Amino acid sequence: MAAFASGLAIIFNSPSLNPVTTQATFLSSNRIRSSPRVFSGFHSLRRRGFRRFSQNVIPDRFNSFSCNCLSAVSTSTIDYEFTDGGKEVELRLRLKTGEILSPKDISVDADGTSLAVKEKRNGLLITLLETNHLFEKIMPSETIWYIDEDQLVVNMKKVDGELKWPDIVESWESLTAGMMQLLKGASIYIVGDSTEINQKVSRELAVGLGYSPLDSKELLESFSKQTIDSWILAEGPDSVAEAESSVLESLSSHVRTVVSTLGGKHGAAGRADQWRHLYSGFTVWVSQTEATDEESAKEEARRSKQEREIGYSNADVVVKLQGWDPTHAKSVAQASLSALKQLIISDKGLPGKKSLYIRLGCRGDWPNIKPPGWDPSSDTGPHPQFT
């Protein structure tokens, strides 16, 4: 996935690939091979009150990590211990061989978002860990490693020292844990042409984040005592869109919710003039594409964003799907979180700005929020942005 400074993040998700084979990153062009630093013993390591992370409570010192992602981590199971010490993170890998290795038998290759650790054994270079999806960016030139008995210790300096890493790699578990500190309670809206896709992706997100799942289709049908299809036949799509807009207004003050919106022409999100209350949360546009490669999908999304012919182009992030399989809903949800993570990291003031927008009444002045007392119906000229 590519991320752009304009705030548009795009994920291209192909069913022929494993979930999130590309993700939003602001990549550094430099790639370095870190230099080893060998210490004589554990006492040489300056500890900084690191805590041990475990997604599940495991009594052993080491967590067992297994991943089948094509571009996340090598498929072999590895034992590791991960700690986040603020500005730095530390990874401890248990070496496969029982012999004491010399630095020349170890290879550590790192760049801004990737890490490859290999061990020479019987003349062969064995991969201990290989990922191009570290949870976030590191400073490659600050990476050091050393051997401590039967463990390889890799110490990396984070680019963003304030961001807490739940784990060394970006995964569903680390994203759902890490996004809580970034979202700060802000809600998420899933928009796009397919109501079914919106529903399934939003449910996965709600479960993962511990948010409340809300479905505008279910709310509308419960209120009207009829199906959406019957409503459209009886009163037309405009009536349904207006009704959903009212529902979104009532939900705009809610926090920690994932809202699934109606797809198609009868959905409010597809209409550019109905986004006043959608701006209260982070919006993810899930869109199917016939593009056969990531670059084509990015260009397609970029054109849609620039032309603004449909309401979906107002979304904060875009997830492009090459085909759809309901069993892959969690993969799309993970891709959505990855894009949102990069968006918020690029501008950490966004959650607070969303909150301010809600407090001022969701007046439609996103992203250039006007001062208190501004009335869109009597606006006669430009106003300074209120932050």
From Swiss-Prot:
GO biological process: one example: response to stress
One family name in Pfam for this protein: SKI
Keywords recorded for this protein, A-Z: Chloroplast, Plastid, Transit peptide
Keyword Glycoprotein recorded: no
GO CC annotation: chloroplast
Localization per record: Plastid, Chloroplast
InterPro entries: CS_dom, HSP20-like_chaperone, P-loop_NTPase, Shikimate/glucono_kinase
Region described as Disordered: 368-387
Main location as per UniProt: plastid
Transit peptide: 1-71
Regions that span the bilayer: none
Family as reported in the entry's similarity comment: Belongs to the shikimate kinase family.
Name this protein carries in UniProt: Probable inactive shikimate kinase like 2, chloroplastic
Source organism (scientific name): Arabidopsis thaliana
